[in-house]
Amino acid sequence: MAIMASRKHLKRFKSPVHWPIHPKEYKWTVKPSPGPHAIENSLPLMIIVRDILKVADNAREARKIINSGEVLVDGRPRKNYKFPVGFMDVVSIPRTGDVYRVLPDERGRLVLHPIDEENAGFKLCKIVNKTTIKGGRTQLNLHDGRNYLSDDEFRVGDVVKLSIPEQEILERIPFEKDSLGLVTGGRHTGEIGKIKKINITRSSMPNTAVIETGAGKTFLTLKDYVFVIGKDESVISLPGGK
């Protein structure tokens, strides 16, 4: 029984550092259920409703709100309070009219950035790999677990703009020199800048990219950490009007 409990629950002091909860307030916290995002890259819906948005005062109220279908993720009601919400997901509460996009800040924490009606109509997803399925068709595998059948013009590292709630591909944002990128990992998490150079090593060493921020700062980061958000300017609104 103890082994099963450890799998179903999560001690607060072992929760990811980006969760906005006090590690010593209580012993246990909600553990995200398996889903589109890994535990280290997500927030349980309960934490969002109770601790971040403060729509509920306690876990019981939060579960009631979530179970009633009042909270939407990417335009669809999610009634599982353990549902993992992650990077680029759009969270909305129609009753209050509030809509947010999940983004990383410069300390590596996931934050809910308020967005307007136009931004609420789409989300961005990165192509993490492609596979060829039966019949020779190409399947795009996205960072949030989605899969799409498409033509072969898309490349790994590109980002697609998806409509919400229809989930249709509206636009391709290519990963290429001079595209605008948001860094999602490493010491430069949350920083935004132009891709000035892409270094393909063709060895066991990881590929890298050189990023230049609007302030003229230049740094090197892993290519996999760069999430393109536009060509000349960002297609999404960003915290602080970046």
UniProtKB/Swiss-Prot annotation:
GO cellular component term of the entry, any: cytosolic small ribosomal subunit
Keywords assigned: Ribonucleoprotein, Ribosomal protein, RNA-binding, rRNA-binding
Domain of life: Archaea
InterPro entries, per database record: Rib_uL2_dom2 (IPR014722), Ribosomal_eS4 (IPR000876), Ribosomal_eS4_central_region (IPR013845), Ribosomal_eS4_central_sf (IPR038237), Ribosomal_eS4_KOW (IPR041982), Ribosomal_eS4_N (IPR013843), Ribosomal_eS4_N_CS (IPR018199), S4_RNA-bd (IPR002942)
GO MF annotation, one: structural constituent of ribosome
Residue intervals of the S4 RNA-binding domain: 43-106
Any single GO BP term: translation
PANTHER family recorded: 30S/40S RIBOSOMAL PROTEIN S4, SMALL RIBOSOMAL SUBUNIT PROTEIN ES4
Entry's family note: Belongs to the eukaryotic ribosomal protein eS4 family.
Descriptive protein name: Small ribosomal subunit protein eS4
Species per Swiss-Prot/TrEMBL record: Methanothermobacter thermautotrophicus (strain ATCC 29096 / DSM 1053 / JCM 10044 / NBRC 100330 / Delta H) (Methanobacterium thermoautotrophicum)
Source organism phylogeny: Archaea, Methanobacteriati, Methanobacteriota, Methanomada group, Methanobacteria
Record gene name: rps4e
